[in-house]
């Protein structure tokens, strides 16, 4: 019997599911809005909200805990510096799920998961490390 067993398996092993949540939460923190299936969005929501709550609490131990769940230093910095400050007065409910129709190829229900009060300029931009182009010496 599986009474009170929470969470969806999403047709994946536990390690694959964990990798999926890590990658999608990093993408959500980076772009502040992603499109995925409704089932994945519903499972991603508590994972991401717990990360934001850890960031709001601050501290070295919480930063290390968040790093073990996120594994992306640039998104970890954004999580603790930008998002924790943005949601300091909000008690939960940091994400929103909006249904986005049905995918044509396999009829899967799609959804947009986004951060509430998001920065609209973050969508589609690369907030990763800045690529510095090397300037060639013209003294040849």
Curated annotation (Swiss-Prot):
Pfam families associated with the record: Ribosomal_L17
GO CC terms in record: cytosolic large ribosomal subunit
GO function terms (MF aspect): structural constituent of ribosome
InterPro entries reported for this sequence: Ribosomal_bL17, Ribosomal_bL17_CS, Ribosomal_bL17_sf
UniProt-annotated stretches for the region Disordered: 119-140
Domain of life of the native organism: Bacteria
Key word Ribosomal protein present: yes
Keywords: Ribonucleoprotein, Ribosomal protein
Gene Ontology BP terms: translation
PANTHER family reported in the protein's UniProt record: LARGE RIBOSOMAL SUBUNIT PROTEIN BL17M, RIBOSOMAL PROTEIN L17
Subunit structure: Part of the 50S ribosomal subunit. Contacts protein L32.
Protein family (similarity comment): Belongs to the bacterial ribosomal protein bL17 family.
HAMAP family reported in the protein's UniProt record: Ribosomal_bL17
NCBIfam families for this protein: L17
Stated name of the protein: Large ribosomal subunit protein bL17
Source organism per UniProt: Zymomonas mobilis subsp. mobilis (strain ATCC 31821 / ZM4 / CP4)
């Amino acid at each position: 019997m599986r009474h009170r067993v929470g969470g969806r398996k999403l047709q994946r092993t536990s390690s694959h599911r964990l990798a999926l949540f890590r990658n999608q939460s990093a993408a959500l923190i980076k772009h502040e809005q992603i499109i995925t299936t409704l089932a994945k969005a519903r499972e991603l929501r508590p994972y991401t909200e717990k990360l934001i709550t850890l960031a709001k609490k601050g501290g070295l131990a919480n930063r290390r805990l968040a790093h073990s769940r996120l594994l992306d230093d640039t998104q970890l910095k954004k999580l603790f510096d930008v998002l924790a400050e943005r949601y300091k007065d909000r008690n939960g409910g940091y994400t929103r799920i909006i249904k986005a129709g049905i995918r044509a190829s396999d009829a899967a229900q799609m959804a947009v998961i986004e951060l509430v009060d998001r920065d609209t300029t973050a969508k589609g931009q690369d907030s990763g490390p800045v690529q510095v182009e090397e300037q060639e010496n013209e003294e040849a």
